[in-house]
Amino acid sequence: MARTIFCTYLQRDAEGQDFQLYPGDLGKRIFNEISKEAWAQWQQKQTMLINEKKLTMMNPDHRKLLEAEMVNFLFEGKEVHIEGYTPPEK
């Protein structure tokens, strides 16, 4: 049975994660406060950041940057700025 949580990012009740996806206290916070839908949105932004900024997860500085962007996006409502990216017009 799916768990329902109040998603901090979406500001509504939504289906929660099945298990903790990220380590440590931040991972616990994500598990308790971020829905599957919001996490999927973050993963799209994360992929774009990694590709456009040519980040490597072997570099501790790159991991710190990505974690800071994740916290800003999921918990502080800040949009991820990706240089050179123009969203498609609707």
Curated annotation (Swiss-Prot):
The keyword Glycoprotein does not apply. The keyword Transmembrane does not apply. One of its GO terms (cellular component) is cytosol. GO terms for biological process: cellular response to oxidative stress. Could be a mediator in iron transactions between iron acquisition and iron-requiring processes, such as synthesis and/or repair of Fe-S clusters in biosynthetic enzymes. Belongs to the Fe(2+)-trafficking protein family. This is Probable Fe(2+)-trafficking protein. It comes from Enterobacter sp. (strain 638). The lineage of its organism: Bacteria, Pseudomonadati, Pseudomonadota, Gammaproteobacteria, Enterobacterales.
